[in-house]
Curated annotation (Swiss-Prot):
UniProt keywords, alphabetically: ATP-binding, Nucleotide-binding, Stress response
Protein name: Heat shock 70 kDa protein 2
Native organism: Mycosarcoma maydis (Corn smut fungus)
Biased composition (Gly residues): 614-637
Any Gene Ontology CC annotation: cytosol
Amino acid sequence: MTKAIGIDLGTTYSCVAVWQNDRVEVIANDQGNRTTPSYVAFTDSERLIGDAAKNQVAMNPHNTVFDAKRLIGRKFDDAEVQSDMKHWPFEVTSVGGKPQIRIEYKGEKKTFTPEEISSMVLLKMRETAEAYLGGTVKDAVVTVPAYFNDSQRQATKDAGIISGLNVMRIINEPTAAAIAYGLDKKTEGEKNVLIFDLGGGTFDVSLLTIEEGIFEVKATAGDTHLGGEDFDNRLVNHFVQEFKRKNKKDLTTNARALRRLRTACERAKRTLSSAAQTTIEIDSLFEGIDFYTSITRARFEELCGDLFSHTIEPVEKVLRDSKIDKGSVHEIVLVGGSTRIPKVQKLLTDFFNGRELNKSINPDEAVAYGAAVQAAILSGDTSEKTQDLLLLDVAPLSMGIETAGGVFTPLIKRNTTVPTKKSEIFSTYADNQPGVLIQVFEGERARTKDNNLLGKFELSGIPPAPRGVPQIEVTFDVDANAILNVSAAEKGTGKSEKITIRNDKGRLSSEQIEEMLKQAEQFAEEDKQALERTQAKNGLESYIYNVRNTTNEPQLKDKLEAADKEALEKIVKEGIEWLDSNTTASTDELKDKQKEIEEQVNPIMTKIYSAAGGAPGGMPGGAPGAAPGGAAPGGDDGPTVEELD
């Protein structure tokens, strides 16, 4: 039986881990990296995910998609989506009020939902785990920022379904990090732990109490839109202005130049966590102009000063909400790559009056680590280390209904431990009112117009009665994924209705998910074909070059008759020319071409080797050398190439 995995689906990087042999193992991808860029690229011939996609982004900026997490579960006219679009080289359009990403793939324009892009990243994480575990993986726990609302959680779950995963549970990133921390530290008594999670695109602060394996989230706050990329943006804008001053040219008109600058800025930012100054050197950045400059840590801190200061507000908020003063916080745990920035650490240390910060867990891997532990528990792992863990999470926003006059009446308050169920009795507003409209909102404002509408439904068929007489019981039921079901029942008649928040909510319908699953399978098939084609091409190429090398081998040179040598040289020349002029040849065409060349080469080789007294070692069947990957080129299957660039 294959194991359940934990996936940290990040804005910029993702990570996958599994619980086995009584411990968590973070799984490295095919490039040997323990985190994988959350990037998907589309080219004329194939789809790339992860490192391969990020590595070619400067050459293909318009068709390389990243930051899907900043779009997932949001509306197109969301202010944050509109502001992000200024920084993205790919096109985002509105389809039915929802953002979709438009790219060109194999010469055709295609649109994808953020869920589909995220599902491709999840698929890559799943494949990484399958390669490591040697079997099919179906079950996973996927993490989201604590501050994600209902639609963002639903959309993340949908992405999991499209990637072919059974998402056992959606858990909050800081909670997962707390498990990673708590598992390492079996301590006596109750501990108040503050998790400070500043990642590539999101920021979360949570305050938990850990006591004898019970993790209870007391409060959570943050910004679903603050992270390392925002610091990169500040650097990019700074250098764009500098380039303009020095060269009187605006490089923002060129997506490739902007991307190369962004990559250099990201590298500079990382360097400044350990060095006081760093240089940026980019040859021929824009219109042939080289860009050489430097930046100090102090200047970087000044550029991002307001963003860094913002990180303290949610810390104050969780302390207020959980009614704990800062002196009572036992541990401050850092999670997320951006917590390596010295200024962020200093602000936090100063806020806690010089307290030591806890850096014992790897900030990049902690979330996936905790998710893997939770996955093991949910799939029935009973090892000594996991059996005592109990996770009590909270609802990030209050949920309730609209009552007379547009007033928001919450049934489930923010920071209530989930899963939870709450019922309240309401009545009619007018005499002989035949039905009621139940409108479900989430948010913290007193009036519904300032909150987020989750969905609505009608309960009709109420018998005529004076206002205030009918009794309508409204029930809110939040499951362990912080996903909501609402029902309303009229007590007199027993008539009831309930809402599946799906479509009003901007959730994908089951038909759309089906369609996307089909597309995902089609992509997987296309990826497989692209791989086979590359292998066939590499096989043919290496066969031709092996023939050329063989004709130049000193011990065979003398055995070759002039006519045969000429024939082989002609075959090699024509083969190379054919490859150059048939760059888009299909797998079958490549295999047929190899067969055709083999039929021309083999008789000549047989003649040489029989004259030389048998084939030299390593040339099975008289063919010139084995193709890479160890397969003899004589076979119909073509050689297999292990490594793809």
